[in-house]
Amino acid sequence: MQSATPGYELEDIDLLLTDANIATMDSAVEAPYGTIENAALAIKNGKIMWLGEQKNLPSFDVFATPTLSIKGQWLTPGLIDCHTHLVFAGSRAEEFEQRLQGVSYEQIAAQGGGITSTVKATRAADHEQLFVAAKDRLNTLLAEGVTTVEIKSGYGLDTANEIKILEVARLLDEHHPINIKTTFLGAHALPPEYKGRSDDYIDLVCNDMLDQVVANNLADAVDVFCENVGFSYTQTKRVFEAAKKHNLPVKCHAEQLSNQHGAELVAQFNGLSADHIEYLDEDGVKAMAQAGTVAVLLPGAFYFLRETQLPPIALLNQYKVPIAIASDFNPGTSPLCSLQLMMNMACTLFRLTPEQSLAGVTRNAAKALGLTDRGVLKVGARADIAHWQISHPAQLSYQFGVNKLLNLWIMGKLI
């Protein structure tokens, strides 16, 4: 928060927001949600240049400064979805119906279903088809106040198609208001042509795939699905070591279905996040706490798969591990496009508080992506700001199926 100083004047402001209640989510502000009531916020060149109680607002040119009254409603940071698989082709709706009719996942996979069907459809799609489908999904997130989204590859599973997915994600960043961060997830699943040769496939991921991804500047991070049905601890470590050589940060799909110690491994590499983590144990939590690795909860997948093993929320709180929440938007296990719904699910399914939930899609989601310029409202931060028609920030987690977004600014521009 910046207060007025004698002779200080706000000059050349692009926009001044007044009469606001602001949930800054800034841990330096002691109030719950980092709240500043009866506040104002000034934007210049896409960043916040002043924020504080309106009574302390410095003088400014009333006639030259565009001003908007928030009328006592609430401002929060723009929401951040830090884990998605948003670029893909095809649908798994028929498979969903089969599962509910009693057909096992193994039977579906034997028929060419499961992730194999998504890989086949994604390989067959061109850049434009993938772009159009993903843009529509991004528009849905944008309408709910989302300003930054992470997009993973992982449905190509060969060099050309993994590159294609990441190229589409970069194009989306150029042509969509939402800011996109990309993650290379070549080690998502074993492609059919490598059946029984998982080490050979990891060779491909660590060498040809990663080399081309880096050469074309297509990834901001590297991820691995470390699981019994994915890749082993040793294979995951190989990918992380390859990423480290290229100075790319790592993250991990860890402990979703069993404890493979992926969270401990990603912490050893000072990784950004361990995601899913239903089977995370205390040693893993300790390692994450020491490394500053974020715990990313994915309640949509938990719900859709009807899982029963809860993430160790009490341990995460005990060791003060930052908790983020994401949609995990994907066609197989979390076909949903609503970060607001995830906030409610994190509270109802995992017993997070509404304040933890909002932190999970703002401040901690930014940390999970290695971003320090967003996720909180403070002087110097990006002016990614959501304006809500709510009476209290807990309402964002309490209600679902009701979108209370009124206005959204990304880098200070009204969307």
Curated annotation (Swiss-Prot):
Keyword annotations of the record: Cytoplasm, Histidine metabolism, Hydrolase, Iron, Metal-binding, Zinc
One Gene Ontology biological process: L-histidine catabolic process to glutamate and formate
Cellular compartments annotated: Cytoplasm
Principal EC category: hydrolase
Record-listed Fe(3+) binding positions: H83, H85, H253, D328
Superkingdom of the source species: Bacteria
Source species of the chain: Pseudoalteromonas translucida (strain TAC 125)
Protein name (record): Imidazolonepropionase
